Regions:
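Short amphipathic alpha-helices and their capping/turn segments at secondary-structure boundaries
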Residues: 1-5
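Extracellular glycoside hydrolase catalytic/binding regions
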Residues: 6, 10, 19-170, 176, ...
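Aromatic- and carboxylate-lined catalytic core of secreted/periplasmic carbohydrate-active enzymes
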Residues: 168-203
Length: 203
């Protein structure tokens, strides 16, 4: 892939995997999936047996191996990985500790879905991901917080985030405006607000 994309101006970065994790204990042979979500399943585990090794060191070795392969073909494009938002000390982002990843990646990226009842969790995630490397919130969407307060959250934290990418379901606001469901109205509200966000968080 890196060989084919190395000279393309369309390639901004390589995201090594979507929401990878290092399991805390051995998993069954072939059990690479984390479980179905919305009808989809995808590979997230990067090993099936940690064999007593520190999870963060397994993640570091995995990133280094992929980075070395990519850099042998493409010295230009950036490299990152989309982190699961996790701040429990025993998990530390499921092995992908931001402090460790900042030493290996060109920028950090995290997926963030703040909860209305516990906004402090999302704030803690951003704090944990604040390192010497730029931070991009690679996914955000009002799944558990209404569009208006979530937009306030984004504006409040623009100073510590280099870029924000909203999860996008493929329907533009114009199409959603003709919808009849609450979900369509909610998504329309969010996308309209999102389009205006550059006035407050634009660089």
């Amino acid at each position: 892939m890196a060989r084919a994309a190395a000279h393309s101006p369309a390639v901004f970065c390589y995201n090594l995997r979507n929401e990878p994790f290092v399991p805390g204990q051995a998993r069954a042979p072939g059990d690479w999936l984390a479980g179905e979500l919305g009808g989809f399943s995808y590979v997230q585990a990067i090993t099936l047996d940690p064999a007593g090794r520190p999870r963060s060191e397994i993640a570091r070795a995995w990133v280094r191996r992929l980075r070395t392969v990519i850099r042998s073909e493409d010295a230009r494009a950036l490299i990152t990985v989309g982190l699961l938002p996790e701040t429990r000390p025993t998990d530390s982002f499921f092995g992908f500790d931001p402090a460790v990843m900042a030493e290996e990646l060109d920028f950090l990226s995290v997926h963030l879905y703040p909860r209305a009842q516990k906004p402090e969790e999302a704030r803690a995630v951003l704090q944990a991901c604040t390192t010497a490397k730029p931070l991009v919130v690679e996914e955000i969407f009002p799944l558990a917080m209404a569009p208006a307060p979530l937009m306030t959250f984004v504006r409040t934290h623009c100073h510590r985030v280099a870029g924000w990418l909203s999860f996008y379901w493929g329907q533009p606001p114009e199409e959603l405006a003709r919808g009849t469901t609450q979900a369509e109205a909610w998504t329309h509200d969010w996308l309209v607000r999102w389009q205006l966000l550059s006035r407050d968080c634009g660089r």
